[in-house]
Structure formats: structure tokens, C-alpha cells
Design a protein with these regions (language model features):
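Catalytic glycan-binding domains that act on GlcNAc-containing polysaccharides
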Residues: 23-195
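Selective for proline/serine-rich intrinsically disordered segments
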Residues: 9, 22-23
Length: 195
């Protein structure tokens, strides 16, 4: 009888555990749909983004447009692998990983400076906090306005050294314009879902 009861509890527990895992939102161009997403039962994406805005002064629409451009809201996103001899999967072009596509070194710097040593790039709340931290350092060190998505994204993509040099390719400027356009759309959409 105990075995029978246990065999019924295990599948239910597994189902509940799996239902708590986040899947990427299917409508990433609609911030209200994105904000219906949760990491587990308790971590609400909208609450996490608002907390980050309050902490660092970077508007929610800027934060979310950056995450959208970097990972498409996929928590396990990584750069594609290069190919050896044109067909054998080889190394990745960078160590970028997670929602924020933070590089290993920059993520370590974030953890040291914030004291958040348990932060994970695959957890949305941690990743959006990283984006806020990074953008706020760009604001304070380079005089970029907190709502200047175009310039914030250029610094995010190139790193602070590349941003300071200012030699951005037309392709990267297009990425930054696209991110700025998305931020503007998100800003308008936020009015209808409590942003």
C-alpha cells in the first residue's frame, strides 16, 4: 500500500516541478504577454524588472528591450558554435550566456561589485538586474541618459572599451536602432498592462 501511494505522489511532484520551469514567451514583441511569464511560482518578471528600475534608474522598457535583443527571452541562450571544416560543431565565439548574454568576465565583475554571488544568468531576475547594473555604469561613466536605448545598447554590445572608441559598424548601429525601436514600442504597451 505504501508503494502504491508513493507511486502516485512522485508523478504529481514531478509535474508540479516541471510546471514551475520557465519557457520562453511566444509573443516577445508584446511586453504585456512577456510579463505574464514567471520563473517558477514566485518570480514574476514584471516585478523583477520594476525592482531593477527602482534600484538602478534604468526604465523597464529599456531593460526589457535589451534582454529581448540579446536572448529573445531564452534563459539558456548561447552564441552559435563555429564549424570546423564547415560542418563539425566547434567552439562558441564568446562566453555569452543566459537571458542577458553576459560574458563570463563581466558576470564575475557584476557578482563581485553587487555581492550577488549566487546570481545565475539563467534566472530572469538576476539577468535583468545585471542589465540594469551594466546600463547604470554606462550612464554614470559615459554620460549616457538612462532612457537612451540606442547608446546604452551600443555600450552593452561593444563593452565599455568599444563604446569609448566609438567605431561602430553599420550592422551594430542597426541592432541598436532595432533595440531602441522595440523599447519605444514596449513603453507604449506598458501603459495598457500596468507598467
Amino acid at each position: 500500500m505504501c508503494v502504491s501511494r508513493f507511486s502516485k505522489i512522485v508523478p504529481v511532484a514531478l509535474l508540479l516541478a516541471l510546471s514551475a520551469c520557465a519557457t520562453p514567451p511566444s509573443h516577445i514583441n508584446d511586453i504585456c504577454a512577456v510579463f505574464e511569464q514567471r520563473d517558477g511560482w514566485f518570480d514574476n518578471w514584471q516585478d523583477s524588472a520594476k525592482k531593477t528600475e527602482q534600484k538602478y534608474g534604468i526604465p523597464v522598457h529599456v531593460l526589457m528591450a535589451t534582454v529581448r535583443k540579446e536572448s529573445g527571452f531564452k534563459g539558456n541562450a548561447r552564441p552559435k558554435r563555429t564549424k570546423l571544416f564547415g560542418f563539425i560543431p566547434w567552439t562558441r565565439v564568446s562566453s555569452a550566456y543566459g537571458y542577458s548574454q553576459a560574458l563570463n568576465g563581466t558576470w564575475s565583475q557584476y557578482q563581485r561589485e553587487t555581492g550577488n554571488f549566487t546570481a545565475r544568468r539563467t534566472k530572469f531576475a538576476d539577468a535583468v538586474d545585471f542589465v540594469g547594473w551594466y546600463h547604470s555604469k554606462t550612464v554614470s561613466n559615459y554620460g549616457v541618459a538612462p532612457d537612451d536605448t540606442f547608446r546604452l545598447y551600443l555600450a552593452y554590445y561593444h563593452g565599455w572599451g568599444g563604446f569609448k572608441r566609438g567605431n561602430w559598424t553599420p550592422e551594430i548601429q542597426k541592432y541598436a536602432r532595432d533595440t531602441d525601436d522595440m523599447a519605444r514600442r514596449y513603453q507604449v504597451q506598458l501603459r495598457s498592462c500596468g507598467g
